[in-house]
């Protein structure tokens, strides 16, 4: 049975097990996996961009970090390499399975939940940072939730879709303002 045949019939979580035997990198795996539009997924594949995003937290190493939507852990790996105390929240169970198998250092810190329903005050009673490659369909809601906790979140960093950035930065009466 060829690898292509196996990949066709396996879930993404099962595919990650094949990595060990077939030497498939996460980047190659992401080419095989289709992002789920219903979850607003878009996988971060560019390692240089991921590292630049992780570098935005260099002044906050003493604070815990919450990564939203880690997917296959491209940004996660840089945050861990830089020594951050990291917790991740991921709604997609296949991505959760992948993270659990490939990032054992995150045991107990992978939350298989919806970020928008998390009680951030309970999870982080003190200050913490938020970072991510934000799902496009809830980017605005993520920022509104972060604003609700602004006393606890000194830094929120990440990548968003250009159109979302234009809406968030638009002044009153601008053509980019959300209706």
Placement of each model-derived feature along the sequence:
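Catalytic cores of RNA-modifying enzymes
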Residues: 14-179
């Amino acid at each position: 049975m060829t690898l292509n045949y196996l990949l066709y019939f396996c879930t993404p979580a099962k595919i990650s097990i094949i990595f060990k035997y077939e030497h498939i990198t996460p980047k190659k795996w992401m080419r095989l996996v289709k992002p789920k539009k219903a979850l607003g997924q878009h996988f971060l594949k560019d390692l240089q961009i991921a590292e630049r995003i992780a570098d935005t937290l260099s002044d906050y190493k003493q604070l815990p970090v919450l990564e939203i939507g880690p997917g296959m852990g491209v940004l996660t790996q840089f945050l861990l390499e830089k020594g951050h105390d990291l917790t991740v929240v991921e709604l997609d169970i296949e991505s959760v399975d992948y993270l659990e198998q490939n990032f054992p250092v995150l045991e107990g810190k992978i939350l298989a939940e919806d970020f928008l329903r998390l009680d951030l005050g309970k999870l982080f009673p003190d200050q913490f940072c938020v970072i991510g490659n934000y799902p496009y369909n809830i980017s605005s809601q993520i920022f509104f939730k972060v604003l609700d906790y602004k006393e606890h979140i000194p830094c929120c960093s990440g990548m968003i879709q250009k159109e979302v950035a234009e809406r968030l930065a638009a002044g009153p009466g601008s053509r980019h303002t959300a209706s």
